[in-house]
């Protein structure tokens, strides 16, 4: 069993420190890495297991990560609220300028987070030494994603935007190259499927009389920002509570989105008028930012990538179905084919394959 343990740690973990070949500290990815009498062994994402000598007596077995009831509830909530938010955003940007809409969503969302933090007795104070790291994480995870996403939603149907947005896991795999993580064969297969889907939708937009190829490109850029940002979160942990972590990135994002709104949409945009313009803002402020954004970062830091990312596979399906139900959007055959390809890409990348015994 001992060589299997060493091999598993080399393949599935990130070697932190080795002293004379005896003392090893590993940060595991949180999947089942060893089989011992049919029982999977592993460790949760971000948990460090310090081993003594590589002997069966001193080896510490840590149970593989499992989902608690609370985590299951968070995943279901994220799936429903984020999935239905695609038609909500599409409706909102037809009623109000998109960049101003997103800025107001985040502004009210930050206030909602403050109240949630008070109720949970979570400190929102960020140590000074973390400011630079948070600024780095904020650029792709918040500014890049929200800026390009909301501009793309204005150009595309909500279902098509959702399909393209959830190419994120593919971009997360590619972004691993920046950290010298080679792309596996499954990663390249997933990338190929996602690119075929993107090209199919792009060609469909070119062929349509009122199509918007720019919308496809903007949504792919947004997804790439999200994927790269998710990778950065795992490589540059802050140790902050998920609520503190998310809240701290809101002010610079609000400033960036506000400036972009003034630049592209002008300064004479009035306040939202009527319930038709206000309710999407409240939905995003409380549902997306105060709940989904915090829950996502919490799961991204506490669960393995495989577990936390599997939850997003159903979101584009919810987006397509809810867009058809609430907005009367009619998906065409390129949308269905692209959806299948994207789901296939996510499955190839996120679902662990069988390993030889």
Task: Report each predicted region and the residues it spans.
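Hydrophobic transmembrane alpha-helices of multi-pass small-molecule transport proteins
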Residues: 113, 167, 183-205, 313, ...
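Glycine-/small-residue-enriched transmembrane alpha-helix faces in small-molecule transporters
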Residues: 6-7, 12, 19-24, 36-103, ...
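Small-residue-rich packing faces within the transmembrane alpha-helices of Major Facilitator Superfamily
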Residues: 83, 107-111, 195, 254-255, ...
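Juxtamembrane helix-entry segments on the extracytoplasmic side of multipass membrane proteins
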Residues: 67-71, 95-103, 126-132, 188, ...
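Helix-helix packing/entry segments at the starts of transmembrane helices
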Residues: 102-104, 142, 146, 160-167, ...
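Cytoplasmic-side transmembrane-helix entry/capping segments in multi-pass membrane proteins
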Residues: 129-136, 183-195, 216, 240-249
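Specific transmembrane alpha-helical segments of multi-pass solute transporters/efflux pumps
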Residues: 81, 85-86, 114-165, 198-200, ...
